[in-house]
């Protein structure tokens, strides 16, 4: 018989840097998860992606055991890294803050493909381009 799910927790945590301190500790504590066990497992699994923010979905079962799935970094984080900027534009229609090439967009779309609900790579690229436009990043050919 399958274990009964009692809670699902979604967090965005820096890769390899999960600590029991807020915001991770309180969110996991409320769900009844072994905080130290989760942070060790998460840090081990994401050690190769240091510096990235990794979304994680934690499923908590009735017996207080848990399992988690790591996702790909959010598109805005990847776009900021590709455009070499720290912050997106507050006025994306008038104030452009950076540029990315179609090749960089394609690379980001390929990375994000498994987490996007896109049928093909072109659709994923259009999604990433839309995110770039809303951040004030120009897409060059």
UniProtKB/Swiss-Prot annotation:
One or more lysine residues are methylated. Belongs to the universal ribosomal protein uL11 family. The keyword Ribosomal protein applies. This is Large ribosomal subunit protein uL11. Gene3D superfamilies: Ribosomal protein L11, C-terminal domain, Ribosomal protein L11/L12, N-terminal domain. SMART domains: RL11. GO terms for biological process: translation. Forms part of the ribosomal stalk which helps the ribosome interact with GTP-bound translation factors. GO terms for cellular component: cytosolic large ribosomal subunit. It holds the Pfam family Ribosomal_L11. Keywords: Methylation, Ribonucleoprotein, Ribosomal protein, RNA-binding, rRNA-binding. The keyword Glycosyltransferase does not apply. It comes from Lactobacillus acidophilus (strain ATCC 700396 / NCK56 / N2 / NCFM). Part of the ribosomal stalk of the 50S ribosomal subunit. Interacts with L10 and the large rRNA to form the base of the stalk. L10 forms an elongated spine to which L12 dimers bind in a sequential fashion forming a multimeric L10(L12)X complex. It comes from the Bacteria. SUPFAM superfamilies: Ribosomal L11/L12e N-terminal domain, Ribosomal protein L11, C-terminal domain. PANTHER family: 60S RIBOSOMAL PROTEIN L12 (PTHR11661), LARGE RIBOSOMAL SUBUNIT PROTEIN UL11M (PTHR11661:SF1). One of its GO terms (molecular function) is structural constituent of ribosome.
């Amino acid at each position: 018989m399958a274990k009964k799910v009692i809670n699902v927790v979604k967090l965005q945590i820096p890769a390899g840097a999960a600590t029991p301190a807020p915001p991770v500790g309180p969110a996991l504590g409320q769900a009844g998860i072994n905080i130290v066990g989760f942070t060790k497992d998460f840090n081990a699994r994401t050690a190769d992606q240091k510096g990235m923010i990794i979304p994680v979905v934690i499923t908590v079962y009735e017996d207080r055991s848990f399992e988690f799935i790591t996702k790909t970094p959010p598109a805005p984080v990847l776009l900021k890294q590709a455009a070499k900027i720290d912050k997106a534009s507050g006025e994306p229609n008038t104030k452009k803050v950076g540029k990315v090439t179609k090749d960089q967009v394609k690379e980001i779309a390929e990375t994000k493909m498994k987490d996007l609900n896109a049928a093909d790579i072109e659709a994923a690229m259009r999604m990433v381009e839309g995110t770039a436009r809303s951040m004030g990043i120009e897409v060059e050919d």
